[in-house]
Every structure is written in structure tokens, then in C-alpha cells.
Amino acid sequence: MAKKKSPGTLAENRKARHDYNIEDTIEAGIVLQGTEIKSIRRGSANLKDSYAQVKNGEMYLNNMHIAPYEEGNRFNHDPLRSRKLLLHKREIIKLGDQTREIGYSIVPLKLYLKHGHCKVLLGVARGKKKYDKRQALKEKAVKRDVARDMKARY
């Protein structure tokens, strides 16, 4: 059975948790245009294949797809534009230092509303190898079987 999204969650990157080991998370605000937030509230955002990057001392979210707003007419946004993330300078420096290490990247894990503002949960992640992914799937299956047996027993 599929998990239900929490009320504030607008989009989730479940593939990231499969492809990466998430070592640290941080919450960031995101600069959006009017038609973008309207489209996001409708559930038209996709975090798959997106990543965050430090450029000129600022953090940007790249490759996040937000579908055009249907009623947006000529003022509609570009679906794949880079979007600026709102973080403190020390947080940007810390994340930049962590991603300079080989194998680390910053991936968005969740897009949600908090007090009416759109936020992104970023994860500092290290890529998994294929054998790590297989091992994780085996462990998950064993855990599920044990839980099923325990439920049947009691």
C-alpha cells in the first residue's frame, strides 16, 4: 500500500533515498514566481533528477520541473529554470565544503509548505553503488517477512 503524503508535503523525491545515502539534511526556502507556487500547490512539481549547486556564493536548485500553470497565459514560467534557495551564508559555505569532497552532492528530498511558505528539504548525499542498492532491497524484504510472520503469530 502506498504511503500517504503528510498534509503539507507537495512533492517528494523517493528515488533519492534509494540512490543515495543521506548523511545530513537542511531546510531551505525557495524563490518562486506566482505561477510556480500556484502550480506547485496543485501538485505539479517533480524533484526527480534535480540537484542543488553553489554558484557565486549562492545556492541554486537545478532541474526541478514545475509544470506550467494552466491559467497562467503569457506570464507563465519556464518549467526547468534554476531557482534560488534561501539559506544563511554559513549554511551555504558548509554545504559547499561538503560537496567539494568526491562523491557528495546535494539533492532535494521533499518540497512542502510551512506557515504558507514553500520550503525544500535538502540532503547531503553520497551515491550508492549497485551492490549497495541490492543489499538494501534484500534487507528490506527480510524485515518485511519478519514483520509479516510476527503479525501472523500474534
Swiss-Prot record:
Query: Which residues does UniProt assign to the signal peptide?
Result: none
Gene Ontology BP terms: trans-translation
Q: Which GO terms describe its cellular component?
A: cytosol
Q: Alphabetically list the UniProt keywords.
A: Cytoplasm, RNA-binding
Matching SUPFAM superfamilies: Small protein B (SmpB) (SSF74982)
The UniProt entry, under PROSITE patterns, shows: SSRP
Read off the CDD domains from this record.
SmpB
| Compartments where located | Cytoplasm
Please tell me where this protein is predominantly located: cytoplasm
A molecular function GO annotation: RNA binding
Would you say which domain of life the source belongs to? Answer: Bacteria
Similarity remark: Belongs to the SmpB family.
Question: What the protein does?
Answer: Required for rescue of stalled ribosomes mediated by trans-translation. Binds to transfer-messenger RNA (tmRNA), required for stable association of tmRNA with ribosomes. tmRNA and SmpB together mimic tRNA shape, replacing the anticodon stem-loop with SmpB. tmRNA is encoded by the ssrA gene; the 2 termini fold to resemble tRNA(Ala) and it encodes a 'tag peptide', a short internal open reading frame. During trans-translation Ala-aminoacylated tmRNA acts like a tRNA, entering the A-site of stalled ribosomes, displacing the stalled mRNA.
Q: What is this protein called?
A: SsrA-binding protein
Organism, as annotated: Staphylococcus aureus (strain NCTC 8325 / PS 47)
List the gene name: smpB
